[in-house]
Amino acid sequence: MRSKQVLLLITLILLSPCAWAQQVPPVTGAEGVVVDVRTGEPIAFAQVVFVGSQIGTMVDAEGRFQVENRQGLVTLSVGFVGYKKRIVTLHANRITKNMRIELEPDVYNLSEVVVTASRHRDRYSRKNNPAVDLVNEVIAHKEQQRPQHDTSQLTYEKTILALDRFDFDFERNALLEKFSFLQKYVDTAQFNQTPVLTVSLRETLSEGDQELARQSTGLDNLLEKEGLSANLDAMFTRIDIFDNTIDLMLNRFVSPLSSTLAVSYYHFYIEDTVAIDGERCVKLMFVPVNRESFGFTGHLYITVDRHVLKRYSISVPPQINMNFVSDLSLDETFSVAQGGCLQSKEMHTYARFYIFKNWRQLYAHHGVFALDGGSGEEASGVSLLDDLRPVPLTAKETVIDSLVTELRRVPEFNAAIKAVEIVGSGYIATASDRERSLFDIGPIYNMVSLNPVEGVRLRLGGMTTANLSSHWFTQGYLAFGTRDLRLKYSATAIYSFRPKEYHPYESLRHALYLSTSYDLENPGQNTDLLDRDNILMSRWPSLPPTAMQYARRVGLRYEHEWQNRLSVDAWVQYADFEPAGALAYHRIGADGSLTAVSRFADWQAGLQLRYAPGEPLYNNRLGQESPFNLSKDAPVFRLRHTLGRTDYRFTYHRTDIIAEKRFWLSSFGHIDTRLHTGVVWNRAPLPSLFTPQSNLSLYLSPNTFTLMRPMEFVADQWVALHATYYLKGWILNRIPLVNKLKLREVVSFSGIYGSLSPKNNPRFGHEGLYALADGTTLFSTTPYIEVGFGIENILRCIRIDYVRRLTYTSGLGKRDLGGIRIGFRLTI
């Protein structure tokens, strides 16, 4: 399945009547231990599954297990390699505790290999193990087997989303009665043969990397303009089992065929021989050494004669630290292509998602099929899909549009859609149906905020939509501070050379922007994710004011974005600045005297090149940096050059180079990094120099310094590094009891080193330069460094860090040396 930073999952579940008026079914389950009947020793990694379903678990290293369901299932199947499978019947509608399930050893011959029940974790040996030898044989030749990329291969992909176990009694529940029409749309899930309500269908036909046709129907189309497609594609990617690391559901898993980790990360067991497409294959079972690690359980089917991977079937252990995913399994079958390499015949991914475990879940099935023959030139669009679709649509899949039409007639459904649109986009449509809204009000997150200069800041704004014009747009706002009593404003006219579906920031962008504004800002503050006046970036008005300034701007900007993820920005701008808060400017005279500067002007012309190879297109109004954008693995490079003239006397050139990259450490988490270096080439006064981005609010904002005051440092040459390591629970998952909280560790580092050359150093008394402002200092030979240690995934979305400043600490109070910061991050 694919999804919109789980926002789609929340939407689909909330939109279903089960989220409003569901009577939670009783629980049937069991807790206990699985042991060897002869020795009484626990059997680690045994599988405990409810018969007729995918609901189950893997027992831990001590043989303990806990499993439950709300679907009325009462029969458990318990098994492990080398043991006879045992069927156990439970008492319905209760949890059976302290169970002791004894498995009887089994002995059977497989070719020349004898498999017995002595496969406990403490007895497992990699030496003289035929299963390990067989895996090593496949790994050694995997480059010869790996499927090759074929630019002419036609591939069909199909994704369905459905509300799982949709078996409500509509007649007996008054709240559900108005949704009784849903019964005629109920289908059967291929995953577990349960009743489901299919709410989304997506089909794609590709030739190599070129997409030939795409078709989608269902509820998610109502949210398409907020970036849904990119997130759907990010969650469901085509995996390669031969890679060392598998990218799945926005996480990284160690492959059972990893050249570096497979044998040490997994235990392998030969289980049986089976026939697949007429070939005898060894059925090889594998389980992770540590059940909390990001790995798989499952089977590899390897041909007996050629030791070629014929098929694999893998699933994710329920103990790992993943959010919102209750079941996840994959199955892929291969054929041998010309040249001896493998070719994928078809691959299936099945998943079930949840918001709250006691609610109905979201079922997803993603299928990828290799097509024989045909050509993308024979037809186009939907007709091409109809001609080449390998599996016919079910009767219920063909009427999803009718389902949506009927749902739109229910007021409660429309209200839920409206609420999700507001949360996802930050804007409120001025019509009941966004397809008729000419103007949207927002962003809602900026309507009220706090800061020491303005006090309570009130803001109201919005933008026109493509329903008014698909090329011409306007946006703006008015803001007012209860303390400074100044009216601020912003107005932008946009012409898009490409027609837009709803708003001007949809990819690909090609537009002109003419803007004017007057507002309060922090020098050096240019946060990536949030505006300065976002409610989360507020500072309590009673705190001492920091360095701020009023800025009046008029500018013209041109933006062009290409499919290869190269974009260019060019702009000219006039700005007039007035110091505010704790900021004051003083100009140095010929005799060394200081003259107060109440305001100054700055002209700029600039050009920026941005390149992000592999970055998916994203259509949210916040752009690629939106917190709702799930896919941020692609590297981003920016080269920016600015020509400016400040105070009508200083002409300067400034160059910035910025690189951002996410480094995955296989299943051990990832490190997000950002490197920013630059130089001001000419003499320039203080306001035109570089000052690091600071953020003194309680909220964690990426790529900012949380304990540095605005304009605390200035430089004309600098290099800054931000790095955050998300460990994904690698440590906490191994601590008993703590691991049940699903907490995850975070370690962060922010550092910067810079210098101010003599030509721009006011201490040398150069006429016309500005003296250093109060509280502003220069870098010594020591870089500025702050580090943070935190816990995330609290309640699935909250992050709490303790941040500590390590350098330039002289004279600072305890509060300025460190503190608690809070962030929000919703991940799978």
Q: Can you annotate each of these PLM segments?
A:
Residues 23-25, 99-117:
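Conserved "repeat-terminator" motif of extracellular CCP/Sushi domains
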Residues 27-43:
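Structural motif
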Residues 40-44, 66-73:
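Short Pro-Gly-centered beta-turn/loop motif in secreted/extracellular proteins
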Residues 46-50, 76, 115, 153, ...:
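Hydrophobic beta-strand segments
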Residues 50-51, 77-89:
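A short, solvent-exposed loop/turn motif at the edges and junctions
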Residues 54-64:
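Short, acidic Ser/Thr/Gly-rich low-complexity loop/linker segments typical of extracellular
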Residues 119-281, 287-295, 356-442, 446-449, ...:
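Structured extracytoplasmic
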Residues 250-255, 381-828:
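Exposed, low-structure sequence patches enriched in small/polar residues
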